[in-house]
């Protein structure tokens, strides 16, 4: 992705952090040819994540909108991570999914998760793919869509 995307995103995040009185480091990396990731690290950044990562999702959407508007480009995905939250969340979801799947296999009854974001549902579906005797499906309508684990 062009450096214009990186500089525009970095400038937006620096301004946002400054307006909130936060000091942080910003690293930018190319995940693949269609995705760039902005990683924010520092102290006391929980306010950027918010309850249920809703603030993180909102900031990511603002970041994407600013980058696409300022660079006149709508190609490529923009990912924002704060303090390694996404990797920690993924590990927690995988562990929780394994626990719920084991309970479901023992009981033979389907198990429904609470509604979650599409990215979290994907993590759960991917984790279920590695568990024998369990399948998963998503049900409901956004923003109340949720994963259901089913015995095979």
Question: What is each of the regions a protein language model found here?
Answer:
Residues 1-152:
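RNA-contacting regions in translation and RNA-metabolism proteins
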């Amino acid at each position: 992705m062009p450096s214009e995307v990186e500089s525009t995103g970095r400038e937006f995040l620096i301004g946002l952090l400054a307006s909130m009185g936060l000091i942080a480091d910003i690293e930018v990396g190319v995940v693949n040819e269609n995705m760039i990731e902005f990683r924010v690290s520092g102290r006391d950044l929980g306010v950027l994540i918010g309850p249920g990562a809703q603030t993180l999702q909102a900031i990511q959407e603002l970041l994407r909108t600013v980058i696409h508007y300022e660079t006149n480009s709508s190609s490529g995905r923009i990912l924002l991570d704060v303090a390694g939250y996404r990797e920690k969340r993924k590990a927690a979801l995988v562990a929780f999914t394994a626990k719920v799947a084991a309970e479901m296999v023992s009981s033979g009854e389907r198990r429904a998760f609470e509604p979650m974001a599409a990215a979290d549902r994907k993590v759960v579906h991917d984790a279920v793919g590695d568990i024998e005797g369990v399948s998963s499906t998503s049900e409901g309508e956004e923003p109340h869509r949720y994963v259901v684990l089913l015995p095979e």
